[in-house]
Amino acid sequence: MVLNFQAFGAAWYTESVDKFKNGDIVGQDDWEIAMNQKTSQIQDKVKHGDVGKSVLVSEKTMVLRKFKGSNASTQYVSLFVRKDDGSGPLMIYIGEDAVKWGAAAKIDIKVGGIITANKGNAGFPEVLKGKLGQWYHFQLVFDFKKKSYDFYVDGKKVVNSFGFRGEGGKGGVNPALGWIFLGWDHPDVLTAYIDNIEMGDGEGKNAGLPNAVDHAGKLVSHWASIKAWE
C-alpha cells in the first residue's frame, strides 16, 4: 500500500498484510518471486498483535517488493520480525541498486535467534543475542549522504553508522530505498515471520507504534471502563 504524505506524514509505504488472501504472497500488492525460489505465505495463525495476518518465511523461499520510493537523504525501514525454528537464517536485504548484491543493509536472524548486520562489505558481526519465538521491532535509518545506516531493535541502537553493503562492491551504489528482499534460498529448515512493514523519509520516530485507529480504539475502551466504574 503506497501512502500520501499529507495523511501519513513521512511514511510512503506501509503494509500489514491483514487484507491479503491467505496463501502465496507473490501476486499480491506487487510482491515477486526472487532468485528462482518459492513464494512465502500469508497466514493468520501467527501475527504481531491479537488480530490480522503475517508473512510466513520458510526454507527455499525468497520474495521481493520494489518501490518508487523517495529522494530524501535520510530514510527508514520499520518492520516486526520473529524467528521460531530452524538452522536456516532469516535474511532481510534492503537497498536500491542490484537486488541482493546491491543491498545497503543485510540483517539476519541466525541459529538460536542471534541477530547480525553487515558492516560495509567487511562482514556480518553479531549485534544482539535474540530469542526464538519472540517478536522484535527492527528499525533501520539510512543516511544516503554518508552511505551508512543505524539499526535499532525494540528501540535500542545496536548498530551505529555501519557502511552500506553494496557500496563499491558488486552492487554499485545505493542512492535511495528501492526494494526489500527476504527469505532463505537453501534447504536448511526455517520458520520465521514478518509483519507491519513501513518505509518513509526521515528517521521514522513514530514507526512501529499503534496507528491512530488503534489509539482511538484503546481510548474508547479506556473511557468505557472508567464509565463502568462511575
Predicted regions: what is each one?
Residues 53-115:
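Secretory/extracellular carbohydrate-interaction modules
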Residues 115-139:
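Short, aromatic/His-centered strand-loop micro-motif at the edge of beta-sheets
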Residues 152-160:
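Short strand-turn-strand beta-turns centered on an Asx-Gly dipeptide
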Residues 161-195:
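Flexible glycan-contacting loops in extracellular carbohydrate-active proteins
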Residues 14-18, 188-205:
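Extracellular, beta-strand-rich glycan-interacting domains
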Residues 8-33, 78, 210-227:
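Extracellular carbohydrate-recognition regions
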Residues 17, 77-79, 134-143, 149-151:
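Short tryptophan-centered beta-strand motifs in secreted/extracellular beta-sheet-rich domains
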Residues 21-54:
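Extracellular glycan-recognition surfaces and repeat-rich motifs
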